[in-house]
Amino acid sequence: MSTDNIPTQLGIAGAVAVLLFLLRRWSSRSTLRNIPGPPPQSQWTGNLKQWFARDGADFQRDVSFNYGPVAKIHGFLGRPILYVADPKALQTILVKEEQVYQETKAFFAMTYLLFGPGLLATAGEKHRKQRKLLNPVFSIKHMRHMLPIFYGVLHKVRDAITMRVSDGPQEIDMLKWMGRTALELIGQGGLGYSFDKLVEDGDNEYGRALKHLQPTLQRINVLRRLIPYVYKLGPAWFRRMVMHYFPLGQVRDAKEIVDTMQRCSSEIFASKKIALARGDEAVMKQVGEGKDIMSILMKANSMASEADRIPEEELVAQMSTFLFAATDTTSNTLARILQQLAIHPDTQQKLREEILAANAEEYMAYDDLDALPLLDGVCRETLRVFPGVTNLARTPTQDTILPLSEPVVGTDGTVMREILVPRGTEILIGIQGSNGRKERWGEDSYEWKPERWLSPLPKTVTENPVPGVYSNLMTFMAGRRACIGFKFSEMEMKVVLAVLLSNFTFELTDKPIQWNISGVRYPTVGKDSNVAQLPLKVGLYKKPTLQ
Ligand code: HEM
């Protein structure tokens, strides 16, 4: 063969390779186009406005339930976005090929800026190392020791609400109370720090910063999308100076909030470090008496081998991470439970009787409280039907094939048993779609029925399990990045309900409650109010006197 031909041959080979690449990309994109889903609302923004709108709950339900376990919506300029609730596909994305399907760059950049290099902001080896150290800290063994802290907080909440309703039933914003309760529970149980005396209507600096974080971020929603491009621009002092003099007040507010959270976390950390160095007696004098998550974590880190130890900066970052991840999620779920119990007074009374019969108000050991069947059913059913986080995004870092448990019929009638997904495709993990599928949970799957947990679950659920860490549900996600605090959260909810239902009754008011779409769903009175709240009529429960 003549060597003169080599450049020509290389050129042809290169052109064929590019052609094959483009063909593969085109064919995979056209596979995505063939997936059923609602038509785009706009040529420019596809279905994005409908999906992210505050009142987008009906649209999200439509996509979750009316097109099958895999559906498609449209992003910018009609770019396909996959909505996935198929069990095998979820297993592949979140467990089997977790390294391929990553959180978006924008997510990592944002969480890093807000909380530092904690669990939410790290990936790969760094994240694995943090989880290795943290998983045992969240074990049931430690949760058992934490229960007295939870009860202590709830008894204060009980006394505070009693003061407000002692003259007769009152309308009370139970979301606000659940927010204060969840913050104090993660404060004492997570950080060994008290935010709120739970008597007066006051709050502290850290609590205030945390409360304003979500609304402030909501107001700079569009600018936030630039973060991945600018967050490593220049040295840290330069970025801080730009933020300090930024012409938009909301951006300066966001910086103030982050600064406050970081300063407070560092102060709490420093005082814990001193106490740990002084020994057990000093630790016992701290809030949480050394049984809180941060104290256990710091101790575990100091005893870990050098290879497993994580730097101080990463320990401090976990504090804001826990506070952020633990408060809105738990408080909104608790508000939803109370609202459901007000809508279903018979279930409210049955649950109260179960709790009173077990004497769970003052204190109950972890395993006994965990075993109360209706209490467990009410928590699981609320987390199933009303997951606070309805969906989360993942993006494959390479072209890949997504296998399915059941075939999807394309819009052109083609039957697909797997889907070719191009690199960079946005995938929405269908938490709501998976938790509520009729094919899995039966014809009444959309209804809130805690009793369904009192008998064995249908075979359609147990024989085709989803990878979720909790109860055949996707509410706390799955795999390496699943919620680390789900047991903590479940125990919080059970102690809150044990104490509140032993003392109070909850009824609906005549105000219309709307649940809004956001990172975590939240209630308002009507669809126009900007104030997150759940007013309920709260009265004292008169316990029957013993004969
Ligand atoms: C009802 C309450 C809760 C819900 C619905 C919930 C839900 C979730 C979900 C869906 C994720 C996955 C996020 C993602 O993949 O991007 C997550 C992660 C996380 N959650 Fe929760 N959560 C709750 C309560 C808590 C509590 C009480 C804590 C702490 C005590 C906590 C700490 C975390 C942390 C640290 C992560 C990040 C885990 C990692 O990336 O390794 N969560 N949570």
UniProtKB/Swiss-Prot annotation:
Pathway annotation: Secondary metabolite biosynthesis
E.C. no: 1.-.-.-
A GO cellular-component term linked to this record: membrane
Entry keyword Transmembrane: yes
Predominant cellular place of this UniProt entry's protein: membrane
InterPro entries: Cyt_P450, Cyt_P450_E_grp-I, Cyt_P450_sf, Cytochrome_P450_monoxygenase
Keywords: Glycoprotein, Heme, Iron, Membrane, Metal-binding, Monooxygenase, Oxidoreductase, Transmembrane, Transmembrane helix
Protein's membrane topology: Multi-pass membrane protein
Residue positions the entry lists as glycosylated: 503, 516
Transmembrane regions listed in the UniProt entry: 6-23, 106-124
Molecular function GO labels: heme binding; iron ion binding; monooxygenase activity; oxidoreductase activity, acting on paired donors, with incorporation or reduction of molecular oxygen
Cofactor: heme
Binding site for heme: 483
EC top class named in words: oxidoreductase
Record localization: Membrane
Domain of life: Eukaryota
PANTHER family per the UniProt record, alphabetical: CYTOCHROME P450, CYTOCHROME P450 12A4, MITOCHONDRIAL-RELATED
Described purpose of this protein according to its UniProt entry: Cytochrome P450 monooxygenase that is able to use dehydroabietic acid as a substrate for oxidation.
Family according to the record: Belongs to the cytochrome P450 family.
Protein name per Swiss-Prot or TrEMBL: Cytochrome P450 monooxygenase 81
